[in-house]
């Protein structure tokens, strides 16, 4: 059996000088699945699983980054994730990797316990959430993205039909740049309140009647949906910029209806 010479110094290849002198904007690890806990709006701790992407900028003269340090960062951060802890993670990553710029992104399922509108039965509904942050030149920007499933009902179908109207499930995706902490539930509420109707995991017959009639009384085109949500985001000072999408999975077509609004309040006229 070979034994390592105590005097042997293991070479640090990635720290050597690269003669090609080409900088790399982003290098790191992608799709790292790792346990995660998050704080809910009520202060409860919710366990989930995050899919992480972590990267830094690599100078032209440096051959490689320290890949193991990205995973080590996740191992060191087991406390429930908050906006401030996430900001601190970015700063810690830059320090560990001796980098001037970097980015962290984590996507995870987030569950909300919802109460049916009539029967009062409770059930969980899942939402896809992404928290992202990037730092460069000492400036850190934070982004919260939420995909919210809702119901939409067509105003034209209601207007021209003797009875009924076509309706479908829709996705509202809000990708907001934050100036202050915004709970995930706050963005979910905005999307659900501006849709024809929200969704629940479990409904009894009286609830189904309510949902059907609620959507019928609140018809919206995909254009209406994004504009109404955008108005709510415009009024929220905690959000400085956003990309907002709505997609209706049309029940009478084999395609979707789609709309997007992008706005940066810092550059608004």
UniProtKB/Swiss-Prot annotation:
Biological process terms in GO annotation: tetrahydrofolate biosynthetic process
One Pfam family recorded for the sequence: GCHY-1
Keyword Hydrolase among record annotations: yes
Gene3D superfamilies registered for this protein in UniProt: Urate Oxidase
Pathway annotation: Cofactor biosynthesis; 7,8-dihydroneopterin triphosphate biosynthesis; 7,8-dihydroneopterin triphosphate from GTP: step 1/1
A GO MF term: GTP cyclohydrolase I activity
Site label May be catalytically important, positions: 154
Reaction catalysis annotation: GTP + H2O = 7,8-dihydroneopterin 3'-triphosphate + formate + H(+)
Keywords assigned: Hydrolase
Enzyme nomenclature, EC number: 3.5.4.16
Similarity annotation: Belongs to the GTP cyclohydrolase IV family.
Biological role: Converts GTP to 7,8-dihydroneopterin triphosphate.
Protein name (record): GTP cyclohydrolase FolE2
